[in-house]
């Protein structure tokens, strides 16, 4: 692990732009995202450096902190990396892990053959904030709390199971550095702008890896078995984690859908001051527009109509209408005219005579100046409201419901003007009338009217 960068594993002293000094072991450097990760980090505060916000030193030791490169002011190497203590090439060894020394901060321990961090068995809960932070959004991460490490940590026996579980945590740290992700829940509570993440393992029982970007609660699930091979491909394991995360996300969406009961009515939302769309829907065909295979045949359509029957039916209607006119007591517009010459022509003999021109004669100037076509006296009654509405629906279609907004403009200005209150408006039809003003200009309410100004002005001038 230290072959690519010679300072990996060195003890680093870092000063941020907030004048806070940190000391820790250099874990990794991400050149793509310009971040630096330190392990076993301790904060020494501002240490009499000039700053607007002095920070006292802290006794807690953080598991690791990722710093943003643009916010680092100074970085020095305190101690070179410790020499690696490698085991002999024994084919019987599958995995190995060294326990920590008595001092958790001064002694780093040795890196394993796969570049993983040494594990520790005893941790204490955090006394820093008294709150738990969300898990880092990386695959396989089980680090859930922002905790501290005790200075007296016990010796962990060489257990391949713990080493295998911690390998997943170190691999997740590499993934976190390469992807540049950070937990959004850490931002409001971090003390320095350079601190991106400070996460510690919760307990000696490491839970199973969590899905990508999801919060993993602390669990007491037993450790994975020791049958995991040391030479397992890490890319294959990452692919498995990404495959598992998708069904879990789908299950989470399904659970959210089940929370809403199918028969429970949802509370309506009423917009104030905005507009609320109509509830009606257009009659849209689901199968798309109609498709015509051939052109319309006008000749065959006209052949279906029997013109003789239509003419016969039309004449029968005219005869019935004339019979109704004859039954009326007064002739059509015969007595309305005040002309004496016309009255003499409309004598009793002419009234009893039959029309020589036949029933198709609609205008006879000898009888009256007016014709029978434009006369409305033959109507028995006016159409009712229901008939008129039905006729309008057949002609123009069914209108949509009008938008029923609530609100409007209500201004309380000076000089006696008062805005409308958004009441009233048309109801029914396809167009909603604009909200009318209630009161219009309403003077004398805490203000002055124009008449008062003129009156006082005249008094001053007169005085």
Swiss-Prot record:
The record ties this protein, via InterPro entries, to: DFDF (IPR025762), FDF_dom (IPR019050), FFD_box (IPR025761), Lsm14-like_N (IPR025609), LSM_dom_sf (IPR010920), Sm (IPR047575), TFG_box (IPR025768)
Biased composition annotated in UniProt, kind: Gly residues: 410-429
Keyword presence, Lyase:
no
Q: Where is this motif: FFD box?
A: 361-377
Chain residue ranges for the region called Disordered: 147-288, 322-361, 398-448
Q: Name one GO molecular function term.
A: mRNA binding
Where it mainly occurs, coarsely classed, is cytoplasm
User: Which of the residues bear the PTM N-acetylserine?
Assistant: 2
The residue ranges flagged as biased composition, category Polar residues, are: 147-185, 194-203, 217-230
Extent of motif TFG box: 380-400
In this UniProt entry, the residues modified to Phosphothreonine are 194
Instruction: List compositional bias (Basic residues) regions by residue number.
Output: 269-283
Annotated ranges, domain DFDF: 284-320
- Where do the Sm domain residues begin and end? 1-81
Q: Which UniProt keywords apply?
A: Acetylation, Cytoplasm, Cytoskeleton, Developmental protein, Methylation, Phosphoprotein, Repressor, Ribonucleoprotein, Translation regulation
Q: Which domain of life is it from?
A: Eukaryota
Residues found modified as Asymmetric dimethylarginine: 401
What the entry lists under CDD domains is as follows: LSm14_N
What is known about its subunit structure? Component of a ribonucleoprotein (RNP) complex. Interacts with DDX6. Interacts with EIF4ENIF1/4E-T; promoting EIF4ENIF1/4E-T localization to P-bodies. Interacts (via FFD box) with EDC4.
The record's family statement is: Belongs to the LSM14 family.
The record's function comment reads: Essential for formation of P-bodies, cytoplasmic structures that provide storage sites for translationally inactive mRNAs and protect them from degradation. Acts as a repressor of mRNA translation. May play a role in mitotic spindle assembly.
- Protein name (database record): Protein LSM14 homolog A
Record the organism: Pongo abelii (Sumatran orangutan)
Lineage runs: Eukaryota, Metazoa, Chordata, Craniata, Vertebrata
